[in-house]
């Protein structure tokens, strides 16, 4: 089957629902495991690469995709319209958009990044503004899933402490520098969550199913 490349971040956007063999598979598996409702906000939509993994796992949430880069959504629309389900795109700054929301979300995915000196890092807003704002915009059983990146000026412990707003689980990888932080009252304890995250990833067919490590925060 053909696959198409999302040029902005050089991550593959599948032409059909299925695994990405990237950190998106873990994030999609966390939605499948922990989501308790139909409303999902995706801050940093880019080319929508995570959507294929979500739909392959049977996640049918209504997705609000937010990004200042609209060309990625155009690419996504051109190859995913037949299978992507309900996806609405907002070309807007993530902080401004989230502040305007009056209805709470069941899931917020924070996947923002910026280029800095040839590296891809977290923007200031992901560290200083969004953590508390996202916590205010989820339901009582809602979850926040953050894709963390090595960022100059922040050790991992400091970065994690600044974006963490409640109980959660941190996922680490053997082949990626990223770390995924899953927060919320429905996340559960690490042994239980790890077992079912890996199960979801095996069902998805993700190559990362055997290389994740989890710890409780």
Ranges and model annotations:
Residues 2-7, 140:
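Short, small-residue-biased leader/transition segments that mark boundaries at the very start
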Residues 8, 150-217:
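Class I S-adenosyl-L-methionine
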Residues 16-141, 152-160, 164, 170, ...:
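The AdoMet/dcAdoMet-binding core of the Class I SAM-like
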């Amino acid at each position: 089957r053909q696959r198409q490349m999302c040029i902005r971040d050089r991550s593959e956007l599948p032409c059909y629902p299925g695994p990405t063999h990237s950190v998106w598979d873990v994030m999609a598996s966390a939605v499948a495991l922990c989501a308790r409702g139909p409303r999902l906000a995706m801050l940093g939509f880019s080319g929508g690469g995570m959507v294929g993994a979500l739909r392959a796992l049977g996640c049918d949430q209504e997705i609000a995709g937010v990004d200042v880069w609209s060309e990625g959504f155009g690419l996504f629309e051109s190859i995913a319209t037949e299978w992507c389900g309900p996806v609405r795109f907002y070309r807007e700054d993530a902080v401004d958009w989230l502040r305007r929301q009056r209805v709470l979300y069941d899931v917020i995915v924070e996947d923002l990044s910026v280029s800095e000196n040839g590296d891809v890092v977290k923007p200031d807003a992901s560290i200083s503004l969004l953590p508390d704002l996202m916590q205010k915009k989820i339901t009582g059983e809602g979850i926040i899933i953050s894709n963390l990146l090595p960022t100059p000026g922040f050790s991992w412990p400091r970065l994690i402490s600044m974006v963490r707003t409640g109980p959660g689980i941190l996922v680490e990888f053997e082949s990626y520098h990223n770390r995924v932080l899953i927060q919320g009252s429905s996340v559960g304890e690490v042994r239980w969550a790890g077992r079912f995250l890996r199960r979801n990833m095996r069902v998805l067919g993700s190559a990362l199913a055997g290389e994740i490590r989890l710890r409780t925060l």
